[in-house]
Amino acid sequence: MQRKILSVAAAVIFAVTATVTVYAESAEKLCYLENTDKSGIGVSAVSAILIEADTGTVLFSKNEKEHRQIASTTKIMTALLTLEAGEPDKEFEVDPTAIKVEGTSMGLREGDIVTRRALCYGMLLPSGNDAANASAVNISGSKSAFAVLMNKRAEEIGMTDTNFVTPSGLDADGQYSCAYDLALLTREAMNNKD
């Protein structure tokens, strides 16, 4: 259990200006320990949440419902939907319009043949905006249509303080989430066996 708590703490520290967290067996609402605000834990992030992985018990929280820009943590939802779309190992050619991106990329080029699984690696490891966009266009036909799917899935998970606009997380008007919702999302993603 201590190892899981340390893993969760590392994820929070790594991902947070907006925040992140762990998994559990279901995406039920999180339960809070008493006095989480008096834990004595010092965190420099504006928003943070630490959850025990198996139970979903909130061990620490700070401004966990405050809306924040969520940047590349958006790609957790994009990867989840990519894997849930099925056929993770089926090959396809990337749409050339999807791979012209700002910021980080996995290095996709016009004519590249990829799988959805490879795109998940590309969006989660080097934080490839091209991978996120290529997946979105492959699944939904456009980034905006994919954002509709992202918001529908967020609602199913119980993410009530989240709105997705882009699959990559590049700042866009109206795109935000909170530490609490990102914890729900991460718990859901960790349950995906692919």
PLM regions: where:
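Active-site-adjacent loops and short helices of periplasmic peptidoglycan-processing enzymes
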Residues: 24-180, 187-193
